[in-house]
């Protein structure tokens, strides 16, 4: 996993690896499609001048944390992608990706749950 990615690079990586269209990424990051498109269309040199968490992207931070934990738990991308769409008892029988899309608080819940599981593993 790349360690020196910025928030926008992580969001793009999530979109590609999880095979999400712009609307799906918008739903699980809780960032408007127009905002995502604005930042994704920036040139690399323009991105360098942005703050660590660019305006309007604060709700996407738990998604990056979720992604990082899932990559640690499931090095196999196919298993990771399967985990996202299979009903899970940790989330009251809901699919994790659907829980993430419910609200920023639900996204944080998924992120927190995965972080807790990661800490429990040796």
Regions inferred by a protein language model and the residue ranges of each:
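Non-transmembrane "mature" sequence context
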Residues: 1-122
């Amino acid at each position: 996993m790349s360690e020196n990615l910025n928030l926008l690079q992580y969001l793009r990586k999530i979109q590609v690896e999880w095979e999400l269209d712009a609307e799906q990424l918008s739903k699980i990051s809780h960032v408007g499609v127009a905002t995502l498109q604005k930042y994704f269309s920036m040139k690399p040199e323009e991105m360098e001048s942005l703050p660590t968490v660019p305006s309007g992207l604060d709700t996407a931070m738990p998604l990056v944390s979720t992604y990082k934990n899932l990559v640690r738990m499931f090095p196999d991308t196919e298993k990771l992608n399967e985990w996202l769409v299979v009903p899970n008892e940790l989330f009251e029988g809901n699919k994790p990706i659907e829980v993430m899309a419910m609200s920023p608080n639900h996204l944080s819940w998924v992120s927190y749950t995965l972080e807790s599981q990661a800490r429990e593993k040796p």
